[in-house]
């Protein structure tokens, strides 16, 4: 077992929490965007569409880098089997809890909102299964992907550790140019795989289980491993925490390319493959933008920040059905998109915080939504991982 840094990575805790909480304005703005969702406003807003696209273009790539960073830190702290058990429990238990308590009621509500309840009995067995796979996993998809990644990394992290024992990691040098080329190739590789599947057997791409377990894992795994490498190599971490005008400019140009692809691309052509290449390199450059920004402004301990770090997962889990409820039953009564967006934020965040405070007072719910046994500690002010 290797030692881990004693200094708390406050800025990474904060970034991870804020990235998760960004899911709230992301999904509320989705209601008012030009993108088709479960519920939409009568007229889309150009600026809220732009805001929605911006968040969507990089948020989860950066999130998985941080997840990989902390996962490898715990990999060095625990024996292999315990590491796998701890990691899977911390993401798997909240996911399994949220399905019957959150996404199943959400699915039932949407069946009536969208007028599909009467047609449900007429669906084939496969269509019912596939619909449930999409709707019950829903916004919990990243937890399922983390379970898959953790299982894969039992082997990957062992290989990384064994290779480090036979090499001098101090001589490893990284550059953003080299990383950009690597991630460009990874994006092209992913695009080739997706296009091949589209040619050979296109229906599998609309299968929810295949999409989450295979395609999402395949896309985000490089970011997860990059996070682990950032923990191992201080030079790589410094590359991300040091502000880079080149990365900022490249990310801005990549986002413009992302918007153009969204506007002019066609799903029947190469839109999704092009998007995977763009978001692969955009995600890499945004790691530098977000890490350097967070390292400069968020690398401190604060009771208020700690509260939201601890609350972020629960708030994210409950915000989705609250957002859809707001979109289905309240949005039609608000004529202004921006007013609706602000009211949605107040509605969702307010109720989510109230529910969070209630669940803290019920030990069983606290365990189910965190995946961690409830342990009473005195003066424990450190944010939970």
Curated annotation (Swiss-Prot):
Its main location: membrane. The keyword Transferase applies. GO terms for biological process: glucan biosynthetic process. The chain crosses the membrane at residues 17-39, 54-76, 88-110, 136-158, 179-198, 213-235, 242-261, 276-295, 308-330, 334-356. Pfam families: Acyl_transf_3. It is a multi-pass membrane protein. Its EC number is 2.1.-.-. Necessary for the succinyl substitution of periplasmic glucans. Could catalyze the transfer of succinyl residues from the cytoplasmic side of the membrane to the nascent glucan backbones on the periplasmic side of the membrane. Belongs to the acyltransferase 3 family. OpgC subfamily. PANTHER family: BLR4337 PROTEIN, GLUCANS BIOSYNTHESIS PROTEIN C. This is Glucans biosynthesis protein C. It comes from Escherichia coli O157:H7. The lineage of its organism: Bacteria, Pseudomonadati, Pseudomonadota, Gammaproteobacteria, Enterobacterales. The gene is mdoC.
């Amino acid at each position: 077992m290797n030692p881990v840094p004693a200094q708390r990575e406050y800025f990474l805790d904060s970034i991870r929490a804020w990235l998760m909480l960004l899911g709230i304005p992301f999904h509320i703005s989705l209601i008012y965007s030009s993108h088709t969702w479960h519920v939409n406003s009568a007229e889309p807003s150009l600026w809220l569409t732009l805001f929605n696209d911006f968040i969507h273009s990089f948020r989860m790539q950066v999130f998985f880098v941080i997840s990989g960073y902390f996962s490898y830190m715990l990999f060095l702290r625990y024996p292999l089997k315990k590491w796998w058990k701890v990691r899977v429990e911390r993401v798997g238990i909240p996911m399994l809890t949220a399905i019957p308590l959150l996404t199943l009621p959400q699915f039932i509500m949407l069946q009536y909102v969208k007028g599909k309840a009467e047609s449900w009995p007429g669906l084939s067995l496969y269509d019912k299964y596939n619909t449930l796979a999409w709707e019950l996993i829903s916004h919990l998809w990243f937890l399922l992907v983390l379970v898959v990644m953790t299982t894969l990394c039992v082997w990957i992290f062992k290989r990384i550790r064994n290779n480090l024992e036979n090499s001098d990691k101090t001589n490893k040098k990284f550059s953003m140019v080299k990383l950009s080329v690597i991630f460009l190739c990874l994006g092209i590789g992913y695009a080739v795989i997706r296009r091949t599947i589209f040619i050979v057997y296109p229906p599998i791409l609309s299968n929810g289980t295949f999409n989450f377990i295979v395609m999402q894992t395949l896309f985000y795994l490089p970011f997860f491993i990059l996070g682990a490498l950032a923990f191992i190599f201080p030079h790589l971490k410094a590359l991300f925490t040091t502000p880079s005008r080149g990365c900022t400019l490249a990310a801005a140009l990549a986002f413009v390319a992302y918007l153009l692809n969204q506007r002019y691309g066609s799903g029947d052509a190469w839109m999704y493959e092009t998007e995977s290449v763009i978001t692969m390199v955009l995600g890499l450059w945004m790691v530098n933008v977000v890490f350097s920004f967070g390292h400069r402004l968020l690398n401190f301990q604060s009771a208020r920040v700690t509260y939201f770090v601890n609350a972020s997962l629960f708030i994210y889990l409950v915000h989705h059905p609250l957002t859809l409820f707001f979109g289905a039953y309240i949005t039609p009564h608000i004529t202004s998109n921006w007013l609706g967006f602000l009211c949605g934020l107040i509605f969702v965040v307010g109720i989510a915080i109230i529910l969070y405070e209630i669940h803290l007072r019920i030990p069983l719910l606290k365990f189910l939504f965190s995946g961690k046994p409830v342990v009473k500690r005195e003066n424990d002010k450190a944010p939970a991982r």
